[in-house]
Amino acid sequence: MNWAKELFKVEKPIIGMLHLGALPGDPRYKYENSLDKLVKLARKDLLALIEGGVDGVLISNEFSFPYQRKMDFITVAAMARIIGEIKSDISIPFGVDAISDGSATLELACAVDADFCRGTFSGVYVGDGGLYDNDFSKLLRRKTELHLDKLKMLYFINPESDRNLDTRSLSEIAKSTVFKAGADGLCVSANAAGEDVDDNLLKLVKDAVAETLVLANTGCKPSTIKEKLKFADAAVVGTYFKEDGKLQDENGNNVRIDSNRVKKLMDVVYQIRKDLE
């Protein structure tokens, strides 16, 4: 867990989500909106997150609905282009998540020299997209081949919107994932983005893997972040940071980051850190 303090330079780091809009090949992509426009919007959101004071940023293809288990080349290529063009503006640690495709996430992290990545790297799940499993034995061997020794991997252990077919308790899954995969961090989520993650689940996982970073992955806002960080070591915040706290507008378009909302949550976090001193 010491790696997080070394990387983010603070206790209880807050990672802000940078949601990319629909990309070429995605059903929601509008071809009149060029990649140049997506780059411009991504840069705007990035600067709003940094201005608001987050400790890290996680870039994902949030609007590539429906998500692919085996991502098309164009999707990860578009992500790499956007990240490459805004990278000079990234002044804090950053990570990537090519949603639902662990291999694409790892390859992308290598290509853009990310500090960390997040994904569904382990387990067997069922959801709207059907049945899928994840083979971290191949993934970790690929990580070795790519010499990604410094890349930190944050594992979902109860992915949003899908059900884990593993009948073991979440605490057993947490222990096993850390032991077998050497997970650098475990992300604990609610059933969907923006929904409040159960404090009891956070405590359960943290008690099971006391020496591993545990992140509150959904539903964090100023009124709840103090309680979440009693059990979690860090938090990933996405929906709350957006204008009016909405993931998307009435037309299904990506909503922009509001730096004032970022500052509001971070002010609470600064006080939490003072209380820890």
Language-model segment annotations:
Residues V10-E11, G16-M17, Q68-V96, N134-L154, ...:
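Alpha-helix-loop-beta-strand connector modules within alpha/beta enzyme cores
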Residues I14-L18, V57-I59, F94-D97, C117-G119, ...:
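Hydrophobic faces of well-ordered beta-strands that scaffold small-molecule active sites
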Residues H19-K44, F94-D101, Y155-S171, C220-K221:
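Active-site mouth loops of central-metabolism enzymes
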